[in-house]
């Protein structure tokens, strides 16, 4: 892989929490960092305070915004799909999709698909997932027959792992790796404090694990893995079900309008 100082790196959801800290550390190491958020003022502030090269504004609950975001990027070495939400009550995106699934999985599926041809090999795609995972119910992906906030979050995060594993298979032959990770358990972030309760780990732990996935030379050529922090780990069994992975891929293409 290229040195960090010779890379352009996009970190989604990087105006707060883990994403902001990762972006700041990458910028400190000399990377050309593209920070992203949905609030223009917070994006501008993050650029100033982290030394990022550019700020990009997009609401990931809107597929049109995701397309506009991708259209602003010419070349990329590393894509970090970090943005995520926990939604207390069932809500729908601008496109009519269940909001947690739309932001945590579908937006990143579309963004990654649109940026694949703009990745400068060797390249890395890092999907920030979670050890909290729930199997996908393909008969009710939009959770119309019952909604609970944490199971919805856990399903969306497992979707990211299925997506990672399937994309890793589809990119065989290209020098592009795709891995997913659980950065740390209940980090001390605003989202955790407001939605899940008392934090159990520091943001610094999550930053270290995420930076390893982004920059560790020992992971050159390593693809289709799930990491719990810095350790290899097993995801939910559904992540290794080829039929489930393909079914999610096909459904994601349909929902994102790229089928």
Which residues fall in each region the model found?
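Catalytic loop of short-chain dehydrogenase/reductase
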Residues: 84-92, 97-98, 121-175, 182-197
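Conserved hydrophobic beta-strands of the Rossmann-like cofactor-binding core
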Residues: 8-11, 76-80, 125
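Rossmann-fold cofactor-recognition segment
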Residues: 50-64
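Canonical Rossmann dinucleotide-binding motif of NAD(H)/NADP(H)-dependent dehydrogenases/reductases
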Residues: 2-35
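N-terminal Rossmann-fold cofactor-binding loop
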Residues: 13-14, 36-41, 60
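C-terminal helical subdomain
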Residues: 198-236, 240-246, 250, 254
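Conserved Rossmann-fold cofactor-binding substructure of NAD(P)-dependent oxidoreductases
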Residues: 60-75
């Amino acid at each position: 892989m290229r040195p960090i100082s010779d890379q352009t790196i996009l970190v989604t959801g990087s105006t707060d929490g883990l994403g902001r800290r990762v972006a700041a550390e990458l910028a400190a190491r000399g990377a050309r960092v593209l920070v992203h958020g949905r609030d223009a003022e917070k994006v501008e502030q993050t650029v100033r305070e982290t030394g990022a090269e550019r700020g990009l504004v997009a609401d990931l609950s809107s597929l049109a915004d995701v397309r506009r975001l991708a259209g602003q990027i010419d070349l990329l070495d590393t894509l970090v799909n970090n943005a995520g939400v926990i939604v207390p009550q069932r809500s729908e995106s601008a496109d009519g999709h269940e909001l947690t699934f739309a932001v945590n999985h579908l937006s990143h599926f579309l963004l990654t698909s649109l940026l694949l041809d703009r990745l400068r090999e060797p390249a890395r795609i890092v999907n920030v997932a979670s050890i909290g995972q729930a199997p996908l119910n393909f008969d009710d992906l939009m959770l119309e027959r019952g909604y609970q906030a944490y199971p919805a979050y856990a399903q969306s995060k497992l979707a990211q792992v299925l997506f990672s594993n399937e994309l890793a298979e589809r990119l065989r032959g290209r020098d592009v790796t795709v891995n997913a990770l659980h950065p740390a358990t209940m980090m001390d972030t605003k989202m955790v404090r407001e939605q899940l309760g008392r934090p159990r780990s520091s943001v610094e732990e999550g930053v270290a694990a995420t930076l390893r996935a982004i920059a560790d030379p020992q992971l050159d050529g390593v693809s289709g893995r799930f990491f719990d922090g810095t350790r290899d780990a097993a995801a939910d069994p559904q992540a290794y079900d080829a039929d489930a992975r393909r079914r999610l891929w096909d459904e994601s293409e349909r929902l994102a309008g790229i089928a």
